[in-house]
Structures are given as C-alpha cells and as structure tokens.
Design a protein with these regions (language model features):
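Hydrophobic alpha-helical membrane-insertion segments
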Residues: 25-29, 94-107
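Hydrophobic alpha-helical transmembrane segments
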Residues: 60-67, 132-146
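Residue-level detector of functionally special positions within alpha-helical transmembrane segments
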Residues: 32-36, 59, 110
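Metal-dependent phosphoesterase/phosphodiesterase active-site architecture
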Residues: 95-98, 138-141, 221-222
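Extramembrane terminal tails and long inter-domain/linker segments of multi-pass membrane proteins
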Residues: 118-127, 156-222
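Accessory "access/gating" subregions that flank catalytic or transport cores
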Residues: 7, 24-35
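Juxtamembrane membrane-water interface segments of multi-pass membrane proteins
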Residues: 1-21, 37-54, 69-94, 108-130, ...
Length: 222
C-alpha cells in the first residue's frame, strides 16, 4: 500500500473508475491494517481472535482488496479486452453501491466482535441481533452493486462506445499492442524508448509504424 501511495505522491491522477478502485483498496487496506494491530497485541487478541472482529478484519484485508481491485482491473482493461469502453456511469453506480454495502457489512461485524459475538456458531444471543441484521442488509447491498456492475459489463460489451487502442495513454507494453490483441501480441519487437517503469512509445501505433520504428532502431534488413 505504501508503494501505491508513494507512486501517487505529487502525481496527477484522475477520477475515473479504475482510479477510484485504487482509492477503495487503499481505504479498505488501511482499515484492515489498523484493526490488525489489535490482533497482534496478545491481551487484545485473547478477546478478539475467536469472535467476529477477526472475521471483519480479514475480510477488509482480502475481500476489500480482491473484490474492488478486480472491479478496477476490469474497468481498466475492458477496452483492451473488448475494444469498447465500460459504461462509466453504470459501472460507477455498481462499484460505489458495492463499496457502501461492504462498509455496512463488515463495520457492523467489528461492532459485533467488540460486543463479544463468537464466530463459527449457528445460534447466538439476541443482543447481537441488530449488528447481524445490519450486516445482512449490507451483504444484500453488495450483491445489488455486483449485479449493476455485471449489467454494465454486458451492456458495454454489446453496444458500448468504441475505444481506441490506448484510451488511457498508458506507456506500458500491454497497451502498445493493437485492439483486438493479435495472436502474437506484437507484429515486431516493441521499441523501448524510456526507463523500465515508463517504457513504451506514447501511444500504440499501427504495425507499419511499429515496424518502421523497429527498423530505425536496429537497422532495416538489406
């Protein structure tokens, strides 16, 4: 997480869905990391390790990064996979709905853990009903958000706005190939023009231009 924050430090970033997913992952990881401090403390862990507090903690660490990271990755690579943009409006509604549901679900689990609700039990005391009802509602909200996001994927795949080969103006090699991606990825070896972590030409080019650049770099065959 520190690497991600350090990468953004003094940088310019934009408010599109893939970037919002990065912020969501950072937020969830921060919550998971802070609550993990309590689980590393022996006196506190004696109380927390067998109840819903630790359940909420590892969901923030694993699901909080995996789910929203996957949604951001889909939004980012959707133009490369399909040649079309993911519907930003519908996708964002689904994303933020799932994010809100995630907070409702697992924040209430922290409360249940602080109250002492044990994990891995079928029945529990009535004092935990409110926390569990709130958590259940949050889980349904996550599901609704995922369905909306799935609808954005399906509708965009069918009739979304056509995207260029490199809509993000990225300079990494995965965006230097054509869309749709040809069988061999590159017709010629890609030209590396910059340092390792900002390599590539500014925009993907057609095969003839790439081949011309390659010939200029290594010498045209005689």
């Amino acid at each position: 997480m520190l690497v991600v924050i350090g990468t953004m430090w003094r940088g310019t970033f934009w408010s599109r869905l893939p970037m919002m997913a990065v912020f969501a992952v950072i937020f969830n990881k921060m919550i998971g990391g802070v609550t993990g401090v309590y689980l590393s403390d022996v006196p506190a862990d004696q109380y927390f390790h067998g109840n819903m507090f630790v359940t909420a903690h590892f969901h923030y660490m694993l699901m909080g990064a995996g789910l929203f990271g996957a949604m951001g990755g889909i939004a980012y690579y959707f133009p490369k996979m399909t040649g079309r943009y993911l519907d930003e409006r519908t996708g964002s509604i689904g994303f933020w709905t799932a994010f809100a549901g995630f907070q409702i679900t697992f924040m209430s689990m922290f409360v249940a853990g602080l109250q002492g609700q044990p994990r891995r039990v079928l029945q529990f005391d009535n004092m935990f009903n409110i926390s569990n009802w709130i958590s259940t509602i949050g889980a349904y909200v996550i599901g609704i958000g995922m369905l909306i996001f799935l609808a954005a994927i399906i509708s965009s795949w069918r009739s979304g706005q056509v995207a260029p080969s490199n809509p993000w103006h990225a300079q990494t090699l995965d965006w230097q190939t054509q869309t749709p991606v040809p069988l061999d990825n590159f017709p010629v070896l890609p030209v590396v023009t910059k340092l390792p972590y900002d390599y590539g030409v500014p925009d993907p080019l057609d095969p003839k231009t790439l081949e011309k650049q390659y010939d200029e770099k290594v010498g045209a065959p005689s």
